[in-house]
Amino acid sequence: MMRFTPPAEPANFEEKVRKAGNNWLVKNPDTKPKDFWSTFKPELAKCCHNLCNYSVMFIPSRMGTIDHYLSKSKAQNRHLIYEWKNYRYALQRVNSCKGTYDRQILDPFEVEDNWFEIILPSCQLILTDTVPDGDRDRAKFTIKQLQLQNSEWVIEQRQEWYRMYLENELNLEGLEKKAPLIARAIRKQLN
C-alpha cells in the first residue's frame, strides 16, 4: 500500500449519485442500495491513475470496482453509500477480500508512503519500521486479509511487472506508472 490523495468530487456527482441515491434510500429503506455510483468508476479510476488503492498496481477500469471503504452493507454506514469521500478504487478480488471489515483495514487515503515496501526478487510486501506502533496490528491485518503480502495471485502479478522491467519491455518511468511500489524497490536496489 501507499498513500493516495483523495480525488476531488466530480461536478455532477451531487445530482447523479448523492441526491438520486439518497432519494432512492428514503423510498426503499429496507432494500439493498441501488447502484448509482458505478457510472463514476471510470472517473475514479482515472483520478487514481488506474492503480488499485490497495495493491498499488495498474488495473483497467473495466476490471476495477468502487470499494465503499466503510461498507455499504452495514446499517450504520447507510448515510455514506452515496458519498464520494467513501469510495476507493480497487481490484474486484481485493474488494471481495475486504468485505465489511471497514476500519480494521487501513485506509489508502491515510497510510504513509513509506509504511510498506516490496522485497525483490520475491515480490513480497512487507511492513517497514516506519509504521507507527498504534497502526502495526491493523497494517498486518490489512495485508493478510486483502492477500497483499505473499498470495499467489499478487506475487504473480508483481513478478510480471518486474519481469517486464528486467527484460526492457518497460522502463523504470513506465513501471512507476503501473506498479509504483516495484519501481520504488528497484530504485532502492540501484542506490
Task: Name each model-derived stretch.
Residues 51, 65, 90:
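The −1 position to Zn-ligating cysteines in a subset of zinc-ribbon hairpins
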Residues 74-76:
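Non-heme iron-sulfur electron-transfer modules
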Residues 65-72:
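Histidine-centered catalytic micro-motifs used for acid/base chemistry in nuclease
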Residues 44-48:
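Sequence/structural segment immediately N-terminal to covalent heme-attachment motifs in c-type
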Residues 50-57:
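Local cysteine-cluster metal-coordination motifs and their immediate loop/turn environment
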Residues 1-43, 57-61, 78-88, 92-191:
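Extended charged
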